[in-house]
């Protein structure tokens, strides 16, 4: 599993999560979270201070 920081933008509101995905998504991918599909807008990498590790950070917008 890949631990990924995700910022979901739904109805103009942003929510931040850390989730385990099967792989690191790339821009344009669709991911399903909480029964809703989101389109990945961008992927960056940042330090997760709690785990002292480099993790991907995804910005995704509600799809459809």
Range-by-range predicted roles:
Residues 37-46:
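Short beta-strand-centered aromatic/proline hotspots
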Residues 16-18, 37, 57:
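Well-ordered beta-strand positions in beta-sheet-rich domains
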